[in-house]
UniProtKB/Swiss-Prot annotation:
Its cofactor is Mg(2+). The keyword Ligase applies. Its EC number is 6.1.1.20. SUPFAM superfamilies: Anticodon-binding domain of PheRS (SSF54991), Class II aaRS and biotin synthetases (SSF55681), Nucleic acid-binding proteins (SSF50249), PheT/TilS domain (SSF56037), Putative DNA-binding domain (SSF46955). The lineage of its organism: Bacteria, Pseudomonadati, Pseudomonadota, Alphaproteobacteria, Rickettsiales. Mg(2+) binds at D474, D480, E483, E484. Binds 2 magnesium ions per tetramer. It catalyses: tRNA(Phe) + L-phenylalanine + ATP = L-phenylalanyl-tRNA(Phe) + AMP + diphosphate + H(+). One of its GO terms (biological process) is phenylalanyl-tRNA aminoacylation. SMART domains: B3_4 (SM00873), B5 (SM00874), FDX-ACB (SM00896). This is Phenylalanine--tRNA ligase beta subunit. HAMAP family: Phe_tRNA_synth_beta1. It is found in: Cytoplasm.
Amino acid sequence: MKFTLSWLKQFLEISASVTEIAEALTDIGLEVEEVIDKSKELQKFEVAYIRNIKPHPSADKLKLCDVETKNGILQIVCGASNVRADIKVVLANIGIEIPKGNLKIKESVIRGQKSYGMLCSEEELLLSSNSDGIIELPKDAVVGDNFTKYYGLDDPIFVINVTPNRGDVLGVYGIARDLSAKGLGTLKELELSEIKSTFFSKIKLNVHDKEACPLFTFREIRNLKNKPSPNWLQQLLKNVGIKTISSLVDVTNYISHSFGQPIHAYDADKIYGGISVDCYIRSDKVISCKNHEMATAVLQFSNDSANFYAINGKGYLLTENDLAIKDESGIQGLAGIIGGAKSSCNDSTTNVILEAACFNAKMVAASGRRLKIDTDARYRNERNIDRNFTEKALNIATNLILSICGNCEVSEVVKVGEQEPQKKPLDFSVYFLEKITGIKLSIQEIEDILNKLGFITDVKGDIIKVIAPSWRHDINILEDIAEEIVRIYGYDKIESIKLPELYQNNNLREYKRISSFKRILASKGYDEVVTNSFMSSEDAKLFAELKEGLFLLNPMSIEENYMRPTVLPNLISIVSKNLARDVKDMAFFEVGPSFVNLNIESTYLTAIISGAFNNKNPHSFGRNYDIFDIKGDLEQVIEYAGLSLDKCIVIDETVLPQYYHPTRAINIRLGKNLLGHFGQIHPKILKYYDINQEIFAFELNITNLPLIKAKFGKRDEFTVSDYQANFRDYSFIVDQDHKVGEIISYIKNFNKKLVKSVMLFDIYSGDKLPEGKKSIAIKIKLQADDRTLSETDLNSFSEDLVASISQKFQGILRE
C-alpha cells in the first residue's frame, strides 16, 4: 500500500515529521517498508526555459533549442513532439545520470549539431511510462530551481506492508484513523456535500443471492464531460504509481485508494437496452429494487461459459462459479475484479453508471486466482469491504465527478441490500488483558483506546461490553481486542522480564535425537525441506477426513486454509513441481507437525523418494527406487532410536491411510502405539498431482517414539571375529499368505550365536510350484565368535532350520 504525506493530510491534521509518522505506523502494526523521497533522488534535475527553437538542418524530427539555465543559454537538441518555445522544462545538465538506463549525460554531437544537456520526459526519470513528450512545468517555476517542488514530487511516499486481516487500512482514511488513535494527529471529519438528484433511474436492479452480493448501489450521471482530471489528483495518483487516464477513471482510483471501496464506471451508452443488475445462483428467488422497469443487464453466475473481454485487453472464459455483470449483449464485468471492455469509459463518454458494491470475498478470491487476474479491486474485495461505508463512498465519488466534469444530471441512489448489522458484543475485562499480555490498564484507559479505534463500549462493573466497528472484519474474539489495545498502547511499553533458567530435560534429548535422524537421512542423499503447516482443504481431503476444528478462521489464502493432517502432501507437491522442471530423481525429508484435531498435534519425520537410485554412478546403470529402499532408510532411523523394525515392532497391515497403495504399504506399531507407516503412494494421489512415476514414503511419529535411555545415542561396539564366516543359500516353499518379513525375522532369531545376517535374494511363484505357494530364496551368514564352524556344525544348523521352518510355517526345502 502506497500513499503520500499530502494524501494523508487530507484526512489527518498532523504536524509530525516523516520519520515520526513512519515509526508510529510500524509501532501500530502497519510496517513501513520504505519511505521514498523523489525530491532527493531527483535533486540534480533543474528548471529550464526554452527561449526559442529552430529546425535541425539535418533531421526533420529534431529541433535546436536555445535553453535558458542558471548557467546561461545552452543549445540542446530535442526530438520530443511537444517541444516548443516559451515553456518551462526539466533539464539534465552534463554529468548527471538519467534514472532510466543509468545513462550519464555528456556533451554530444547529434547529426552534426552540438547538444549540451537533455530535456527530460517522465519515462526517463522513472516517474511513469509516459514517453510522449518532455515534462512541462508551471510558468511560475523559477529557472535553476530543483524541479520537483513544481511537479508535486516534494511529497514523501510511504510504502507499508498490510497484513491480510487489515483490509480496513487499504485506504488512506483507515491509516489516518489508526494514527489518530495512536495520538499522532487528529482525524478530520469527512465533508459530505448534499447531492441534488434530478431524476429517478429507470434501471432495474435484481439480486438473486445476498451471500454473493450483500450490497449493490449505483447512480446514473448524465451529460458529463470526461476531461483530464485536475493536477492535484493526477499528481497524487502518479506519485503512488497509478497511471492517470481521465476524470472518471482517476476519481474511481482515488476513492478506492482513499477509502478502500472499489468504484467502477460503466459507459451507459454502451449498455444495450439500458442496464439492470441481477445476482443469482440458478434460482428463481429474486430480491428486487422497486420502481424500476428496464431489465436488460444482469449480475449473475455465468452459466453459459461465455467469453468475457476485460478492460486489460484480455479475454477470459468464465464458468458458473464466476460472478458476472451482464447486459443483453453479454458480460460487462467480472464482479469485484475487473470491468469489461465493451462498456469501458473513454474521453467521449457523457453518460455513466457509477457502481459501488460489496461482493463475497471468497468468491472474488477464487475467481481471481483461477483466471490469474490481479487488480486493486480484487485485492480490496477479497479482504472484505466495509458495507456500511459503501453508499457514502459512492456519494463522495459522485460529488468529485460533479466538481470536475461540469454540470451533470444525477439520479437517486439505486440500491439492493442492506448495511451490515451491528456485531454481537464481547465481554472484555481488565483481568483478561493482564492475564494474556501482562499489561495493567484501567477500565477508562482501555475504553479510551477502543473508542478512538471506533469500537462501541459499555462498561458494566468490571466488564466492558465491546462491539467492533463495521470495518473491522477481523475482530471476533477477546484476544483480537487485546491485540488492538496493546498495539495502540505500545509494544515498547511492555516491561521485559528475565527468562527462566533452562534445564536439560527430555526436550533437549528429543532435539538431539531429531538432529541425529536428520544427519542419517542427509548421509543417505536426502535433502531436508521445510514447508508450511497449512494447506488447502481441497488437497487435505485426499489424505484425511476434514475436521471442522482444523479450518483456519483467518487464512492467509484459500490455499492455506487448513491445518495439515500429514506432511506428505507438501512433499508430494514438491515432487510434482520438480517433475514439471524435468527433475526426476528425488529424495526429501521434513520434520514437522501434523494435526489430528485441535487437541492432538504430533511431530513427524516424513521422507519421500521417487525416480532413480544412484543414477550418476559411472559404474552402474542405476535402478529405480522401490519399497525396500524406503524400508531400509526407516530401519536405520528406528535402530538409532534404540529399536529394531524386526525385533521390536509388530507389522500391521490393517487400516492403512487412504493415500497409501492398499497392498504395498504397512503400518508400524510398538505395542498399542502407532509409530507410522511406510510404502508406496496410491496411484489416485499421483494422478491428482499430475505425477507419472512411483513414489515411496515413510512417516514416523516421533511424538510416539519412546526415548530409550540405555540405547539412545549409543552404538554396540563393532568387533571383527577371528574366525571364518560361512554362507548358506536356502530356498523354501511356503504358502502365499505367509509374510516374507515374518519368516526372515524368525530366521534371524533362530540361532543368535551363529546367524549374523539374513538376505532375501529371490521370490518366485509360477507354474512350477503348486497353486497357492511361493518360493523364497535367502542367503544366511553363519559365524561363531569362539571357533571355526565345522561341516558337522553347518549340517546340524541346516537340519534344525529346515525342521523348524517346516513346523512353524509348513515350509519345505526346495530341491
